[in-house]
Amino acid sequence: MEKLYSENEGMASNQGKMENEEQPQDERKPEVTCTLEDKKLENEGKTENKGKTGDEEMLKDKGKPESEGEAKEGKSEREGESEMEGGSEREGKPEIEGKPESEGEPGSETRAAGKRPAEDDVPRKAKRKTNKGLAHYLKEYKEAIHDMNFSNEDMIREFDNMAKVQDEKRKSKQKLGAFLWMQRNLQDPFYPRGPREFRGGCRAPRRDIEDIPYV
């Protein structure tokens, strides 16, 4: 009996030892499993971080060429504007540089202008117009009136106006002649004068310095 009891106790102790040994092993296993899960999570986090960093780097790399392309386009536009401005300035410079040559010519032009009379400065067309007198214009107007569709009254009225113009011209000529006559009398005291200071009539002979008696 004692042997059986001792054997039973030995079996119980062995079972207790086995259970105690199995329990810590079982307890350690969850830790191992936890550590494995943590490692997996860490690896996944690392991969996510790596993916994020890779995406960010890709975006940065994509953004850089765009910014570089914009910078290049801006530079090309600025260079084009500078070239345009430089070309315009270069085109404007030859005109300015050509001025000294044109400035050297005014001396010869002024000399030629000094030799020419003042009438040569008037254009030829203007000369032709000014050379025509009032009588010529009236004659042309008379010829043109016949071609116009005027009634008899209008024709008579136009001819009357033309006659008035001719009379005014004649009177103005007489006034100018009298004015010139007065100036001539004032300038030359020995100019022959008629009665009542009118031109013509009985004129006294002109007396020169030789005819004045010596006193």
From Swiss-Prot:
Keywords from UniProt, A to Z, are:
Acetylation, Nucleus, Phosphoprotein, Transcription, Transcription regulation
- Positions carrying N-acetylmethionine are 1
In Swiss-Prot or TrEMBL terms, this protein is called Transcription elongation factor A protein-like 4
Question: Where does it sit, as one GO cellular component term?
Answer: nucleus
To which protein family does this belong? Belongs to the TFS-II family. TFA subfamily.
Pfam families for this protein: BEX (PF04538)
Q: Which residues carry this modification: Phosphoserine?
A: 6, 88, 102
InterPro entries on file: TF_A-like/BEX
| Compartments in which it is found | Nucleus
Q: What residue spans carry the region label Disordered?
A: 1-133
Residue ranges under compositional bias (Basic and acidic residues)?
25-102
State what this protein does.
May be involved in transcriptional regulation.
